[in-house]
């Protein structure tokens, strides 16, 4: 890690993703998409978690490793919660043609339908679902920061609207949590 001219810690130069990263490599690989986002390639099953590949409302300190139009296929996008640094409406919309499914909490699934015309699969905390051979469990995440600010108290923010994910693959267990 290095520090930029503003005194901010910044990641090293971005490693661009290529078509090869979407191929079945016989194991599980994890790619950082920037911020809280990751792509998992497990035996050729492609999962993107909280991909913010475009449409973020603040300047980024990195170059994004892949643009939505460069993504070849996604078996599922998983979204942990509705904050714009995890749920990019623009990215989700622009992945629709290559994405087979979207999985998230019930609340975020309702936003996906309303805002993006995406039929997201809503789940409760502790629910399990399968993507190929991958078992995915929604885990609790204490992230209802809106409760602390009066200006955001226009609705009740429930704990079940934010989650982490626990992925069990043939050769790896991966925990993606949110605080």
Spans of model-derived segments:
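Short, basic/low-complexity N-terminal boundary segments at the transition from targeting/disordered tails
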Residues: 1-22, 101-108
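Active-site HxH/HxHxD metal-binding segment of metal-dependent hydrolases
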Residues: 65-129, 140-146
């Amino acid at each position: 890690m290095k520090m930029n001219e503003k005194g901010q810690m910044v990641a090293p130069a971005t490693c661009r993703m290529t078509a090869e990263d979407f191929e079945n490599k016989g194991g599980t690989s994890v790619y950082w998409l920037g911020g809280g986002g990751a792509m998992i390639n497990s035996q050729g099953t492609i999962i993107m978690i909280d991909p913010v590949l475009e449409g973020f409302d603040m300047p980024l300190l990195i170059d994004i490793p892949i643009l939505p139009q460069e993504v070849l296929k996604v078996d599922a996008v998983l979204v942990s919660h509705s904050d714009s640094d995890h749920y990019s409406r623009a990215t989700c919309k622009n992945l629709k043609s290559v994405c087979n499914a979207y999985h998230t909490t019930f609340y975020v699934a309702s936003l996906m339908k309303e805002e993006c015309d995406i039929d997201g699969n809503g789940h409760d905390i502790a629910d399990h679902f399968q993507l190929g051979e991958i078992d995915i469990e929604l885990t609790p995440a204490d992230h209802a920061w809106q409760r602390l600010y009066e200006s955001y108290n226009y609705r009740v923010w429930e704990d079940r609207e934010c989650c982490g994910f626990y992925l069990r693959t043939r050769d790896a267990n991966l925990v993606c949590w949110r605080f």
